[in-house]
Amino acid sequence: MARGAHQAPGGFWTVAAAPTRCSLPHSLPIPLHAAAAAAAWMAGVSAASAAGKIGSFLSKRPYAPPSWASHLSPAPSQTFSLGHFPTPIHKWNLPNLPNGTEVWIKRDDISGMQLSGNKVRKLEFLMADAVAQGADCVITVGGIQSNHCRATAVAAKYINLDCYLILRTSKLLVDKDPGLVGNLLVERLVGAHIDLVSKEEYGKIGSVALADLLKKKLLEEGRKPYVIPVGGSNSLGTWGYIEAIREIEHQIQISGDVQFDDIVVACGSGGTIAGLALGSKLSSLKAKVHAFSVCDDPGYFHSYVQDLIDGLHSDLRSHDLVNIENAKGLGYAMNTAEELKFVKDIATATGIVLDPVYSGKAAYGMLKDMGANPAKWEGRKILFVHTGGLLGLYDKVDELSSLSGSWRRMDLEESVPRKDGTGKMF
């Protein structure tokens, strides 16, 4: 869909301005007052030609930070257009909310198809830096069904770079073909080079040393590798969600009648919550950020987020910016039957499909906390950030099969007369 303006089904206005990073695009599928809608529509129409310019997608462009983040350094000077932004915000009619509580959802799961989810925002800055440094390939590390690794593989091929992935799996599978399930299918289709390590090897050596080993090997072969950390989470990648806060700010300005008290998001590597928390504090948003960690523990993430904030030469403190709660359950990428049933029930009730590794656990943790501490959430407007990861569901097919919708053989009588449709097949 072009980044212009149209009236969506149900009387919602979706308005988008030119996708320049210095003047961020606007989009909010929220009912607008008539005058505001008309003004926003005119602005969208005037910008539509620039937004829909052939070749603007996948292009590199100059970047200037939001005014409220201009003191942070180092600040990126360029970014790639890799995602379909702005992503919409709409009301999420979750069941059993506390009195007066509203939950809205930021749909970063639809920032693209092969290249979707929260990792795209980080990669827009990281890939621009890789190209600026003259890289001809990128290296990154993750789990066997890593959304970040899949997004990195696709983004690299978009801009003509090779991609090397170090994927963590069980010691029983490390010497076997990893297959074509979920994210692996996309990674292998786009030609990513995959090296497997066991969880034990990963724990002993660590992601940084593993990436350095592969980098050294590639340098010896005459390649020019650029290392992207786990989840794209470093100080440069943090700018992805600082920029997302500017996007949300503009969407709120267009709406004129929605203000968010809280932002809720999953946390798996720390960069997304660092950008959201820092941006929310510095901008006009001022929403409290609540992160539900799906691995490690809150203490680790507070320390890591603090390192990212320090890396941008800010004197703000992680504990003042974000509340981090443990939602890892059985462990990273592992689910209880109750968690998977929750994912299925939410999809059935609202049409929103959550991934089982990140947003599914975050939403589960959020609603569980609302049930246990309703007064904490009563009367508040919450923005839940859906970070994508839909392909991760394919790794849970066996576990979900007993929970999925029923089917039946259609009961037909032999006497039913034929009526031809369109085409020979019908």
UniProtKB/Swiss-Prot annotation:
InterPro entries: ACCD_DCysDesulf, D-Cys_desShydrase, TrpB-like_PALP, TrpB-like_PALP_sf. The active site is at residue 146. Inhibited by L-cysteine (L-cys). Disulfide bonds: none annotated. GO terms for molecular function: D-cysteine desulfhydrase activity; identical protein binding; protein homodimerization activity. It comes from the Eukaryota. Its main location: mitochondrion. Its EC number is 4.4.1.15. SUPFAM superfamilies: Tryptophan synthase beta subunit-like PLP-dependent enzymes. Residues 1-63 form a transit peptide. Optimum pH is 7.5. Stable at pH 5.5-7.5. One of its GO terms (cellular component) is mitochondrion. It is found in: Mitochondrion. It catalyses: D-cysteine + H2O = hydrogen sulfide + pyruvate + NH4(+) + H(+). It holds the Pfam family PALP. The modification N6-(pyridoxal phosphate)lysine is found at residue 119. NCBIfam families: ACC_deam_rel (TIGR01275). Belongs to the ACC deaminase/D-cysteine desulfhydrase family. Homodimer. PANTHER family: 1-AMINOCYCLOPROPANE-1-CARBOXYLATE DEAMINASE-RELATED. This is D-cysteine desulfhydrase 1, mitochondrial. The lineage of its organism: Eukaryota, Viridiplantae, Streptophyta, Embryophyta, Tracheophyta.
